[in-house]
């Protein structure tokens, strides 16, 4: 019998393949995105030290959001993570889409981060 592949397991495999090629350094850390049904999370990570430099999510109290699982919320998270990263002196990052397609909420977060000052 043919079984349907688990989407999250497929995403994790795709993410592992991409992560084998992507690393964040102190000069150019990695902007990681995690998306759930209700929320979206973004972290700027220095993989050499294994340290999260800045993070933002739809759970932050700084963001007054009506809905948290939509493109508008992802845009605000992108702006916030970029603002916090620029304040810490990070201007360039490597974008890690977390195995998700570059579409919808992931794309909105990335474009908002670019407009707010991050380069990738």
UniProtKB/Swiss-Prot annotation:
Keywords: Ribonucleoprotein, Ribosomal protein, RNA-binding, rRNA-binding. InterPro entries: Ribosomal_uL18_bac-type (IPR004389), Ribosomal_uL18_bac/euk (IPR005484). Pfam families: Ribosomal_L18p. One of its GO terms (molecular function) is structural constituent of ribosome. One of its GO terms (cellular component) is cytosolic large ribosomal subunit. One of its GO terms (biological process) is translation. It comes from the Bacteria. HAMAP family: Ribosomal_uL18_B (MF_01337_B). NCBIfam families: L18_bact (TIGR00060). Belongs to the universal ribosomal protein uL18 family. Part of the 50S ribosomal subunit; part of the 5S rRNA/L5/L18/L25 subcomplex. Contacts the 5S and 23S rRNAs. This is one of the proteins that bind and probably mediate the attachment of the 5S RNA into the large ribosomal subunit, where it forms part of the central protuberance. This is Large ribosomal subunit protein uL18. It comes from Bacillus cytotoxicus (strain DSM 22905 / CIP 110041 / 391-98 / NVH 391-98).
């Amino acid at each position: 019998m043919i079984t349907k592949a688990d989407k999250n397991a497929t995403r994790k495999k795709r993410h592992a393949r991409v992560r084998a090629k992507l690393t964040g350094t102190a000069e150019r850390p990695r902007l990681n995105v995690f998306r759930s049904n209700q929320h979206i999370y973004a972290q700027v990570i220095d993989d050499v030290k294994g340290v999260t430099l800045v993070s933002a999510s739809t759970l932050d109290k700084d963001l007054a959001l009506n809905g948290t699982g939509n493109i508008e919320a992802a845009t605000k998270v992108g702006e916030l993570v970029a603002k916090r990263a620029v304040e810490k002196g990070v201007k360039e990052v490597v974008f890690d889409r977390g195995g998700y397609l570059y579409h919808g909420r992931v794309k909105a977060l990335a474009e908002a981060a670019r407009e707010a000052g991050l380069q990738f």
